[in-house]
């Protein structure tokens, strides 16, 4: 039997569009909705079905497309499907994952376009140019209604008529949850759920809570993303939430990615790696993760996949197996006999897609690309500064048109000038301690009595979310992440600067933290260690982004408190 190959997309290099712009493009959105419906309807035992592709990440516990390892699955390996979480392969393994879904949807879109009786040539062109959209949560933490709240959407069908149809982006409906062998609570839910209002059989999406949680996380998400671009310079620190040697002062791409999973899922599917891809928002999320990888790589163009280990193993990688840029990225077949490897996946253009920030750039001029992308990162995610203007991408068509509007100068932007101190909380823990996803919530000021209010509290500085399979294990997996603090201080206090003599007393007096399980209950985390660090930084008028110096650890701020720094 031949394999389903992950192949470069046809139609030339086309940009993936941000979902807020994508839903305004009638042809692209109409084809996407119909193609997704067709993929959902594909029999579950077929490799190109949504059920099979989503199941690659974890459940059901079956091989995908005959991709098996060189040895039998080891009992010491904790089943995680094929995905390479906690590994230096995390960014590169997920690139063909989004691509295979995009490839299948593209095929459906082209077949659908051929059935249009009105303006067929335009629909066929739109289908050829179709690329999967991404959700830029670092700029727009709350997705558009077409993704999270509209049970029906209006599309143009092949007869040229506007028609209201069920919205496939809201949820995926299982033929039978028994087909996946899921554990509770997923074995009693017929559809995927986001921030469900209970764990019972009749649980429903809680859209209002989803919006509130995501909105309250916006400032922290934006800042964490910006810091990742500016401070993370090596592949081990960039690629994985597993602590790497040499120390880091900012979140990895995987750590930020974890935050989105738990914020969207709550106690629902997106919060559990074993079932997360069944929620269609997973691929909007991971398309953006892929975009951030492309942007970071354009800035750090001399850095790519470095050696590491497979952590707890996968269906084809043994426990702690050494991995590098030549490791097979199973189950993604490049040919009938070979898998894709990380060193073959560096260029998105070679795979048939790009992102709006790269449109019109000469990708062979790496220094020029570096400067342009650095500037765009500052415009998209950096605090607005005097004289700087924000980038607005107008992607109503398949080509990027850039316009500019005056930027509002935020209070954070006013304080980040010249020499300044950038404050963060370093969060360490054993991700497997409690057997489910959880959130370490950092507060300045009073903490609400009701744990359900923690993630929407105005006193929440930010949170570090652990994205964990809901099964207990004795394996210890230390994880590290960071919660930026400056943006909260700027917007909620009257401090004139981030100077040590001003900020340190504020943190020593008012800083508190709590642990919230995915099911909404509070917990104690014995492995938790919260340490405050200050990164001396400098922002000049001739550079778009600040330069950082070695961090200073203020261990005394949290030492002696439960979950605080263990060293004095």
UniProtKB/Swiss-Prot annotation:
Residue ranges, compositional bias (Basic residues):
399-408
Name the residues annotated as site: Cleavage: 382-383
Reactions catalysed, as given in the entry: 2 L-dopa + O2 = 2 L-dopaquinone + 2 H2O; L-tyrosine + O2 = L-dopaquinone + H2O
Name the needed cofactors: Cu(2+)
Nucleus among the record's keywords?
no
Q: Where is this cross-link: 2'-(S-cysteinyl)-histidine (Cys-His)?
A: 83-85
Keywords from UniProt, A to Z, are:
Copper, Melanin biosynthesis, Metal-binding, Monooxygenase, Oxidoreductase, Thioether bond
SUPFAM superfamilies in the cross-refs? Di-copper centre-containing domain
What detail does the entry give on cofactor binding? Binds 2 copper ions per subunit.
GO terms, biological process: melanin biosynthetic process
On whether Metal-binding is a keyword of this UniProt record, the answer is yes
**Superkingdom assignment:** Eukaryota
Entry function: Copper-containing oxidase that catalyzes both the o-hydroxylation of monophenols and the subsequent oxidation of the resulting o-diphenols into reactive o-quinones, which evolve spontaneously to produce intermediates, which associate in dark brown pigments. Involved in the initial step of melanin synthesis. Melanins constitute a mechanism of defense and resistance to stress such as UV radiations, free radicals, gamma rays, dehydratation and extreme temperatures, and contribute to the fungal cell-wall resistance against hydrolytic enzymes in avoiding cellular lysis.
Record protein name field: Polyphenol oxidase 1
Q: What is the source species?
A: Agaricus bisporus (White button mushroom)
* Gene label: PPO1
